[in-house]
Amino acid sequence: MPKFKAARGVGGQEKHAPLADQILAGNAVRAGVREKRRGRGTGEAEEEYVGPRLSRRILQQARQQQEELEAEHGTGDKPAAPRERTTRLGPRMPQDGSDDEDEEWPTLEKAATMTAAGHHAEVVVDPEDERAIEMFMNKNPPARRTLADIIMEKLTEKQTEVETVMSEVSGFPMPQLDPRVLEVYRGVREVLSKYRSGKLPKAFKIIPALSNWEQILYVTEPEAWTAAAMYQATRIFASNLKERMAQRFYNLVLLPRVRDDVAEYKRLNFHLYMALKKALFKPGAWFKGILIPLCESGTCTLREAIIVGSIITKCSIPVLHSSAAMLKIAEMEYSGANSIFLRLLLDKKYALPYRVLDALVFHFLGFRTEKRELPVLWHQCLLTLVQRYKADLATDQKEALLELLRLQPHPQLSPEIRRELQSAVPRDVEDVPITVE
């Protein structure tokens, strides 16, 4: 049988004392139950933390007590109803039930508030420059065609050829619209004629996806749209149309509206200005549909050129599109606005191909026999060309330009142009190699 091992610390004491002795013993009774703290941390700061639910209750009780005190002492009127929590993305505007706004409209309104003075102020035009530009304007300009004119021509073609169904149609066939479609887009027309902010009708947003989008657009009467509706329409068509179709929208809808607004108010509405900037999303269509037709019309005023030119200055434009536009402007018949656009494009300091530079030089050399007094804008454009690209000119071009200065002088600008040309090293002059003996 194994030996019994006594417990440690007991010594010679009895294993179990009598119950009476245990009760009477003072060291056997504990004063209280030991509190166990598990998972509460050791810092007092954590024990004093108030949870979010308790915080809300405290604030609610404090608010109720404050309202009771104000009502009891008569220091406050009827407590105001709790204000609904709203997320505001822009400045407050009076609206009639238009809670859902377009995602970019608050940004546009904020920009209008910040820059309204700059764009709504009248453009300062020098009378002398304006008279000089009018001398080079086309005296018999071609009639301006709008989208309505082209649609009516196509409708007339369709009516004359309706008898021969299988014949070759020279124009775009214009099918008759369903009466329900006409009713829908006449309703869209009413919305766009009064549009200020908010979302556009879904029927209008799907127009770029339609094959006969021009005919549908004609039903909505773009000339009756508000400026804000024109901006939103430009956003939609610039994003969803192909470049060729976007060019037609710019040329037939946006450009006539911009020119009419400038001619009537002597300034451009801010929303139309933003529409011109948004149209640069497709730079090729912008040049072919807005800038080039504006120059080719021969009736571009100085005010129009300054407004459109400011967009060229502010926006980034790919070099290929700018080079093609400069080449086209240099080869067309001259008008005063051409010098403004060329100077602004030259100031962007692109690495232009030699073909474009040669076309620009020939453009200026074509004025050697000009009898009319050239405007200051023409001399400023020539100075910009020489300052930016004097190292890319050939020797014969440099000599021809010096001869041009003698034939078409300007008292202030010609000496500066001559100094730039004389200090430049032509591109066809090679460096003399250094020989070491």
UniProtKB/Swiss-Prot annotation:
Keyword Nucleus appears in the UniProt entry: yes
GO CC aspect terms: apical part of cell; chromosome; cytoplasm; cytosol; intracellular membrane-bounded organelle; membrane; nucleolus; nucleoplasm
Record has Nucleus as a keyword: yes
Extent of Basic and acidic residues compositional bias: 71-87
PANTHER family linked: BYSTIN
Protein name: Bystin
Domain of life from the UniProt record: Eukaryota
Principal cellular location given in the protein's record: cytoplasm
